[in-house]
Amino acid sequence: MGKPFTLSLSSLCLLLLSSACFAISSSKLNECQLNNLNALEPDHRVESEGGLIQTWNSQHPELKCAGVTVSKLTLNRNGLHLPSYSPYPRMIIIAQGKGALGVAIPGCPETFEEPQEQSNRRGSRSQKQQLQDSHQKIRHFNEGDVLVIPPGVPYWTYNTGDEPVVAISLLDTSNFNNQLDQTPRVFYLAGNPDIEYPETMQQQQQQKSHGGRKQGQHQQEEEEEGGSVLSGFSKHFLAQSFNTNEDIAEKLQSPDDERKQIVTVEGGLSVISPKWQEQQDEDEDEDEDDEDEQIPSHPPRRPSHGKREQDEDEDEDEDKPRPSRPSQGKREQDQDQDEDEDEDEDQPRKSREWRSKKTQPRRPRQEEPRERGCETRNGVEENICTLKLHENIARPSRADFYNPKAGRISTLNSLTLPALRQFQLSAQYVVLYKNGIYSPHWNLNANSVIYVTRGQGKVRVVNCQGNAVFDGELRRGQLLVVPQNFVVAEQAGEQGFEYIVFKTHHNAVTSYLKDVFRAIPSEVLAHSYNLRQSQVSELKYEGNWGPLVNPESQQGSPRVKVA
């Protein structure tokens, strides 16, 4: 009797487990059974002292299907977005402006440091005042740059220019790195941030209401505190943990800070950065040429920032070795050495306020393992710490497809930015000129999210049943989700059409319908579409060979330039 009962119980458990798995799988599949798609605009906004954050509701069926959500960050002049992190990777496209990005990667050394000589000249000051500052590498970005933030890694951004920085972020909430649910979460390390995703709070409140009121008083206090992650600890505990006093611990919690998650840095931000130092030196040289008066005894606290064209030229120089670079770490190391040589040439001319650690007589901590691989502890410095996290995608010289009368297309994937392989993301930048057409195509292995940065255009998306699930106009500031294998085509309006496409695969493959026609034998096409051979030849070989088309020039030269 015991054996049949055991078998029956095991069968029942297996049946229940299979049913549960099937229900979860069916629920996930049903999220993409969309009969129509909508152009989405931001649902929520958080205004801070130094800027604005707008978010899209992650519960939109289109976003749930793609497993992503989107946010838009606007940084005013001298605006600082406070350090935060999320349990999933984040891909950011800079639609406007320029600035600085700081990423605090665990286990990596602080390679930017104040010079030792500067501290020694302070003579009479106390030992605490002589301590020199140091931090991890700072990356600079310009319009058209794509930034990648690893999951769980704190980052901050700062506007170094005179115009607002506009950054669009894709949050890949369904990424395998996220071991939580797909509800968007942002963990702030500082400030008193407001709620960016109200749907997250609503779900938490529903869970609490189902769980009863066993911890009612504690939960109420928790809700009243809010703020950064440090606000969940007591002042006494923070003081003990960081070996400081409770006054500093209270400031870390920022209970009365009304600036929220973006603050304005009065007078500008001063950090250790070779690029900012070079720009400061250039500005000082201009002052020397313009004025015959004596140079002030101390440089300004915040160096002014160079012109956008200079930044783009520097970025373009970084991109040149892309087709045949030996390794990512070596390329950045060589680039840093070039910057150091430039700084050393200018050293006798004047003392510097800030310098990179690599210009000091003593060698940086991570440089010796690079020279002698046998002494490397675990290779972290070569793999994670030197990982390139940004690349410009909007520069015309980066175009993969180009038609002078229709537009251009640039692709960014793990082949051009290897870090994307770890995060399973890629991107495409499309610029369509007046009336230009991006012919029908689909993604073989990825969902995509279109965000319009300039202009407006007509977009049509067709599902597996041949129905147009979206047929309308997209304008600046709107986004549209295109599920995997859905066929999409775009045409620019009178003012052109410019947009970024986020894709949920590190090497997303796009199939163009025109290419498919050319890959199929003429006889197959003739019988499939009931065409004559002359019509098949016209279908396969007439018109543009690439995906970019201008209908007004179709009767002219059929050639299209491919970069």
Curated annotation (Swiss-Prot):
<keyword id="KW-0708">Seed storage protein</keyword>
<feature type="disulfide bond">
    <location>
        <begin position="32"/>
        <end position="65"/>
    </location>
</feature>
<feature type="short sequence motif" description="Vacuolar targeting signal">
    <location>
        <begin position="551"/>
        <end position="563"/>
    </location>
</feature>
<dbReference type="InterPro" id="IPR006044">
    <property type="entry name" value="11S_seedstore_pln"/>
</dbReference>
<keyword id="KW-0020">Allergen</keyword>
<feature type="compositionally biased region" description="Acidic residues">
    <location>
        <begin position="279"/>
        <end position="294"/>
    </location>
</feature>
<dbReference type="Pfam" id="PF00190">
    <property type="entry name" value="Cupin_1"/>
</dbReference>
<dbReference type="InterPro" id="IPR022379">
    <property type="entry name" value="11S_seedstore_CS"/>
</dbReference>
<feature type="disulfide bond" description="Interchain (between A5 and B3 chains)">
    <location>
        <begin position="108"/>
        <end position="385"/>
    </location>
</feature>
<feature type="domain" description="Cupin type-1 1">
    <location>
        <begin position="37"/>
        <end position="250"/>
    </location>
</feature>
<feature type="signal peptide">
    <location>
        <begin position="1"/>
        <end position="23"/>
    </location>
</feature>
<keyword id="KW-0926">Vacuole</keyword>
<feature type="domain" description="Cupin type-1 2">
    <location>
        <begin position="391"/>
        <end position="537"/>
    </location>
</feature>
<feature type="region of interest" description="Disordered">
    <location>
        <begin position="266"/>
        <end position="375"/>
    </location>
</feature>
<feature type="compositionally biased region" description="Basic and acidic residues">
    <location>
        <begin position="364"/>
        <end position="375"/>
    </location>
</feature>
<comment type="function">
    <text>Glycinin is the major seed storage protein of soybean. Glycinin basic peptides (GBPs), and, to a lower extent, glycinin exhibit antibacterial activity against Gram-negative and Gram-positive bacteria (e.g. L.monocytogenes, B.subtilis, E.coli and S.enteritidis) by forming pores and aggregating in transmembranes, leading to membrane permeability and, eventually, cell death.</text>
</comment>
<feature type="region of interest" description="Disordered">
    <location>
        <begin position="108"/>
        <end position="136"/>
    </location>
</feature>
<comment type="subunit">
    <text>Hexamer; each subunit is composed of an acidic and a basic chain derived from a single precursor and linked by a disulfide bond.</text>
</comment>
<dbReference type="GO" id="GO:0045735">
    <property type="term" value="F:nutrient reservoir activity"/>
</dbReference>
<feature type="region of interest" description="Disordered">
    <location>
        <begin position="199"/>
        <end position="228"/>
    </location>
</feature>
<dbReference type="GO" id="GO:0000326">
    <property type="term" value="C:protein storage vacuole"/>
</dbReference>
<dbReference type="InterPro" id="IPR006045">
    <property type="entry name" value="Cupin_1"/>
</dbReference>
<feature type="compositionally biased region" description="Acidic residues">
    <location>
        <begin position="335"/>
        <end position="346"/>
    </location>
</feature>
<dbReference type="InterPro" id="IPR050253">
    <property type="entry name" value="Seed_Storage-Functional"/>
</dbReference>
<keyword id="KW-0758">Storage protein</keyword>
<comment type="similarity">
    <text>Belongs to the 11S seed storage protein (globulins) family.</text>
</comment>
<feature type="compositionally biased region" description="Basic and acidic residues">
    <location>
        <begin position="347"/>
        <end position="356"/>
    </location>
</feature>
<dbReference type="GO" id="GO:0005783">
    <property type="term" value="C:endoplasmic reticulum"/>
</dbReference>
<keyword id="KW-1015">Disulfide bond</keyword>
<keyword id="KW-0732">Signal</keyword>
<dbReference type="InterPro" id="IPR011051">
    <property type="entry name" value="RmlC_Cupin_sf"/>
</dbReference>
<dbReference type="InterPro" id="IPR014710">
    <property type="entry name" value="RmlC-like_jellyroll"/>
</dbReference>
<keyword id="KW-0256">Endoplasmic reticulum</keyword>
<protein>
    <recommendedName>
        <fullName>Glycinin G4</fullName>
    </recommendedName>
</protein>
